[in-house]
């Protein structure tokens, strides 16, 4: 009797192992199919040096900044900051670029309408996010000084990464680019986001049809207070700057990101699958599949910590001033040394 049970036990064990293997392989195949949706690109682009390449009518809405310090020539050339770049094996810094094509296709002539750096500490499982003001004046190879947002249009993600490394001495070798048009669709996939609106913001959104940026978009009628926004309205909110400044615009972008994260945390597996199918084809990165997988394996640890993102904007108050760049365009002059030190302290908790 024992001899009869033994083969049955072996068969059951083998069957379970085979079943687990099949499930694992299917799971890996599914996961890999999602990774295949992403556009992998090293971010390089031949630098364009034509003088009319930037968007001529682009404006910079910034709060009143002081004049340049007496020892700074506000109209002079911007010099690259000297010094070493600090590195920590436990910290991964990723440049996040939001490009504003207003179509479902990437355009190499797009500009980076949002520039952020997300810092992931895989030892402490903390997430930190900085927003970089788009109007910061930076040196551009083969050109005069210009806004940091235009570096993407001149030389792609590679040039923007290089500029961030050079100007802020920040260790960033990886980037993720997202088409803003697909962000709107992604927000719709997760059922919208809750955003608190001021009276001025509500009035602006209710008149958004006058704004060519929102032409043809499904902008809701909103009110002051908490609103549940669809994708188009959330993106219109994230773009607002006319009623106050570029600084507040950055805050709004981060507000939308946090609201979307909050919504995703409460989404079921079917919603997450639809979200991945909608957004991943319009994601471009130089992260490898192996690097993405390593970071994905850390996600449970990040979530278990229950930590919110620590956030800040660069440049900080008291470290910037009015400056002038290409063709007399107003720019933000920056004390790069001071901001580099601030970032080092923020990301690595060292002085």
Spans of model-derived segments:
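C-terminal solvent-exposed extensions
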Residues: 42, 47-84, 90-92, 100, ...
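Structured segments of extracytoplasmic/periplasmic soluble domains
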Residues: 97, 103, 135, 162-173, ...
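Gram-positive cell-envelope targeting signals
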Residues: 1-41
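Second-shell loop/turn segments in exported
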Residues: 102-107, 146-154, 169-174, 224, ...
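Extracytoplasmic/secreted envelope proteins and their assembly/folding machinery
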Residues: 114, 145, 149, 157-165, ...
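Solvent-exposed, acidic/flexible segments
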Residues: 87-93, 99, 107-111, 141, ...
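Extracytoplasmic
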Residues: 89-92, 110-115, 124-132, 143, ...
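Flexible, polar/acidic helix-loop-strand segments at domain edges
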Residues: 85, 182-271
């Amino acid at each position: 009797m024992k001899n009869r049970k033994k083969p049955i036990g072996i068969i059951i064990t083998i069957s379970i192992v085979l079943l687990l293997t099949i499930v694992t392989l299917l799971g890996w195949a599914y996961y890999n199919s999602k990774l295949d949706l992403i556009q992998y690109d090293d971010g390089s682009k031949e630098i364009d040096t034509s003088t009319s390449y930037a968007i001529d009518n682009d404006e910079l809405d910034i709060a009143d900044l002081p004049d340049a310090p007496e020892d700074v020539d506000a109209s002079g050339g911007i010099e690259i900051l000297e010094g070493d770049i600090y590195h920590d094996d436990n910290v991964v810094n990723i440049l996040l670029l939001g490009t504003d094509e207003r179509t479902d296709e990437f355009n190499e002539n797009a500009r980076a309408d949002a520039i952020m750096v997300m810092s992931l500490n895989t030892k402490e499982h903390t997430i930190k996010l900085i927003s970089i003001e788009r109007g910061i004046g930076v040196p551009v190879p083969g050109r005069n000084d210009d806004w940091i947002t235009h570096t993407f249009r001149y030389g792609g993600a590679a040039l923007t990464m290089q500029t961030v490394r050079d100007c802020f001495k920040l260790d960033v070798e990886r980037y993720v680019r997202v088409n803003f048009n697909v962000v709107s669709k992604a927000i719709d996939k997760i059922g919208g986001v809750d955003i608190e609106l001021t009276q001025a913001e509500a009035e602006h959104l209710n008149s958004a049809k006058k704004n060519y940026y929102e032409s043809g978009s499904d902008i809701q009628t909103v009110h002051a207070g908490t609103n549940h926004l669809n994708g188009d309205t959330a993106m219109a909110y994230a773009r607002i700057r006319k009623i106050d400044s570029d600084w507040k615009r950055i805050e709004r972008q981060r507000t939308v990101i946090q609201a979307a994260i909050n919504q995703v945390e409460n989404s079921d597996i079917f919603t997450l699958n639809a979200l991945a199918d909608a957004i991943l084809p319009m994601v471009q990165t130089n992260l490898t599949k192996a690097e993405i997988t390593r970071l994905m394996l850390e996600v449970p640890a990040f979530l278990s910590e229950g930590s919110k993102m620590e956030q800040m904007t660069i440049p900080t108050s008291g470290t910037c001033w009015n400056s002038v760049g290409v063709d007399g365009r107003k720019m933000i002059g920056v004390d790069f040394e001071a901001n580099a030190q601030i970032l080092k302290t923020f990301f690595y908790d060292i002085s």
